[in-house]
From Swiss-Prot:
The gene is atpD. Gene3D superfamilies: 2.40.10.170, Bovine Mitochondrial F1-atpase, Atp Synthase Beta Chain, Chain D, domain 3 (1.10.1140.10), P-loop containing nucleotide triphosphate hydrolases (3.40.50.300). Signal peptide: none annotated. Its main location: membrane. This is ATP synthase subunit beta. Its EC number is 7.1.2.2. It comes from Bacillus caldotenax. Produces ATP from ADP in the presence of a proton gradient across the membrane. The catalytic sites are hosted primarily by the beta subunits.
Length: 473
């Protein structure tokens, strides 16, 4: 076990000098453990990660927790290995920090639990699955217009309070119930309150037993926020590679991962790049994103909440993320204001999987016709607002008539919201979704009142609601 000494502390960055020419490898974890000798000192149990070799037997490291109380001359021990975290069944239903230590007050992880290093190479080219397979979510608007790919990366855009968390919970619920799949949630640099709320909501909705949670929140040093996404990814990779599972990995928020890297970049002595970001931005993002993929054994599908600074989509942080995405789900406040939940914008959400060779010709044609109808309705709204419906041609009246039914039919009740709404949630298979929208486009339900289409699952539920109202079907 090699020992060194702290020679410089610059906020979250610590320089350590080793004796006898021994230098720990890049990414090795170093430990500083110090017992307070008087009331002016504090107990220190700190993990550092080696980032640079400076020469002269000195390394520059990033601290995974606060460096308060650290002084020059303190002893540092090289663990001889990278940070490693527990993986497997022991992680389910638990909450961890970046080092894989439980923070939910539910007891320690067994000492014999398997631990894997957080830095690992991406799967080799020959290990990747070549088939593109759709991940059925049971959420109509997603499955029809912006389908998710197994092993794909999905960007989730949305402001505060439009339903990102509820959508995430429903996806976790549906993957657990319908696919028996595991979910891993990585809270990266977001509010502690939101993490706490999410944990308790998951407990209440019963999906926590199929979920592992990892947090490195806003109040933590940049080292923790930089590495916590890798901790979550390592836990997800075990379920994919060792158990052949289809795993959902949620990262909230991927922008904070980049932000944390930029905070320490200048302190590490790197020359800033565009807008002050780290010069290694694309490399760091690539190392994370390339590990999220489908292999012959299983898949890791990632849903990443993306904050766009000052709504500037050309900012290097979101722009670098976009190049990795397979699909986007855009949540919009104006959709939520119409009482349509999930508040997904059907025209702004996209997916590279919406192609006839992947989803099939019928699904593709129905989805495109739905988008055309909604786009035409959007164009007509100004005319309707000024002149009213009577001034429209018969053809345009029919477009508006069907578009409103489509809009409402894109909504549905969620299982995880059942305790608030009192309405049972619905999981709609893709085939049923496509059939329902096809029949609406064909005019089969033009005679039914449009409010009957709101917050239902399959198209049969619309017919039943209309019958209950006394409408002749």
């Amino acid at each position: 076990m090699t020992r060194g000494r702290v020679i410089q502390v610059m906020g979250p960055v610590v320089d350590v000098k080793f004796e006898n020419g021994h230098l720990p490898a890049i990414y090795n974890a170093l430990k500083i453990q110090h017992k307070a000798r008087n009331e002016n000192e504090v107990d220190i149990d700190l993990t550092l990660e080696v980032a640079l070799h400076l020469g002269d037997d000195t390394v520059r490291t990033i601290a995974m927790a606060s460096t308060d109380g650290l002084i020059r001359g303190m002893e540092v021990i090289d663990t001889g290995a990278p940070i490693s975290v527990p993986v497997g069944e022991v992680t389910l239903g638990r909450v961890f920090n970046v080092l894989g230590e439980p923070i939910d007050l539910e007891g320690d992880i067994p000492a014999d639990a398997r631990r894997d290093p957080i830095h690992r190479p991406a799967p080799k080219f020959e290990e990747l699955a070549t088939e593109v397979e759709i991940l059925e979510t049971g959420i109509k608007v997603v499955d029809l217009l912006a389908p998710y790919i197994k092993g794909g990366k999905i960007g989730l855009f949305g402001g505060a309070g439009v339903g990102k968390t509820v959508l995430i919970q429903e996806l976790i619920h549906n993957i657990a119930q319908e696919h028996g799949g595991i979910s891993v949630f990585a809270g990266v640099g977001e509010r502690t309150r939101e993490g706490n709320d999410l944990y308790h909501e998951m407990k209440d909705s019963g999906v926590i037993s199929k979920t592992a949670m990892v947090f490195g929140q806003m109040n933590e040093p940049p080292g923790a926020r930089m590495r916590v996404a890798l901790t979550g990814l390592t836990m997800a990779e075990y379920f994919r590679d060792e158990q052949g599972q289809d795993v959902l990995l949620f990262i909230d928020n991927i922008f904070r991962f980049t932000q944390a890297g930029s905070e320490v970049s200048a302190l590490l002595g790197r020359m800033p790049s565009a807008v002050g970001y780290q010069p290694t931005l694309a490399t760091e993002m690539g190392q994370l994103q390339e590990r999220i993929t489908s292999t012959a054994k299983g898949s890791t599908t990632s849903i990443q909440a993306i904050y766009v600074p000052a709504d500037d989509y050309t900012d290097p942080a979101p722009a670098t993320t976009f190049s990795h995405l397979d699909a986007t789900t855009n949540l919009e406040r104006n959709v939520a204001e119409m009482g349509i939940y999930p508040a997904v914008d059907p025209l702004a959400s996209t997916s590279r999987a919406l192609a006839p060779e992947i989803v099939g010709e019928e699904h593709y044609q129905v989805a495109r016709k739905v988008q055309q109808t909604l786009q035409r309705y959007k164009e007509l709204q100004d005319i309707i607002a000024i002149l009213g419906m009577d001034e429209l041609s018969d053809e345009d009246k029919l477009v508006v008539h069907r578009a409103r039914r489509i809009q409402f039919f894109l909504s549905q009740n969620f299982h995880v919201a059942e305790q608030f709404t009192g309405q049972p949630g619905s999981y709609v298979p893709v085939k049923e979704t496509v059939r329902g929208f096809k029949e609406i486009l064909e005019g089969k339900y033009d005679h039914l009142p449009e409010d009957r289409f709101r917050l239902v699952g399959r198209i049969e539920e619309v017919v039943e609601k209309a019958k209950a109202m006394g409408v002749e079907v």
